[in-house]
Amino acid sequence: MARKRIAFIFTQGPHGSSAGREGLDALLATSALSEDIGVFFISDGVLQLLPQQQPEKILARNYIATFGVLPLYDVENCYLCERSLQQRGLSKMADWILDVTVLSPADLRRELGTYDVVLTF
């Protein structure tokens, strides 16, 4: 049986919704079963990787640092949408909490098209 390539897309900001935390939990669980995982951050999802967040000030759980351990789970294909960064006034050279490749929307779509399963959070 051929191995499925699985993509996780984060589209929402880290606070105000549980989507990011749930997506990260699903990603970690899937990493135990699959080695071919890609992680994509688009739209407000790029905010998931900003350093120095203080969610405890809004009484939210700080799960963001957990993204930084993805390489320990052999999850190394991580991508940020360049246009999403520009729209939010963020630099593609920022000190993200995870090593990522910044891609243009066209390149991001092309890369995403190589995955068999796409899960969006």
Swiss-Prot record:
Keywords: Cytoplasm, tRNA processing. One of its GO terms (cellular component) is cytoplasm. It holds the Pfam family DsrE. GO terms for biological process: tRNA processing. Transmembrane segments: none annotated. It is found in: Cytoplasm. Its main location: cytoplasm. InterPro entries: DsrEFH-like (IPR027396), Sulphur_relay_DsrE/F-like (IPR003787), Sulphur_relay_TusC (IPR037450), Sulphur_relay_TusC/DsrF (IPR017462). Gene3D superfamilies: DsrEFH-like (3.40.1260.10). The keyword Glycoprotein does not apply. SUPFAM superfamilies: DsrEFH-like (SSF75169). The keyword Cytoplasm applies. Part of a sulfur-relay system required for 2-thiolation of 5-methylaminomethyl-2-thiouridine (mnm(5)s(2)U) at tRNA wobble positions. Belongs to the DsrF/TusC family. Heterohexamer, formed by a dimer of trimers. The hexameric TusBCD complex contains 2 copies each of TusB, TusC and TusD. The TusBCD complex interacts with TusE. This is Protein TusC. It comes from Yersinia pestis.
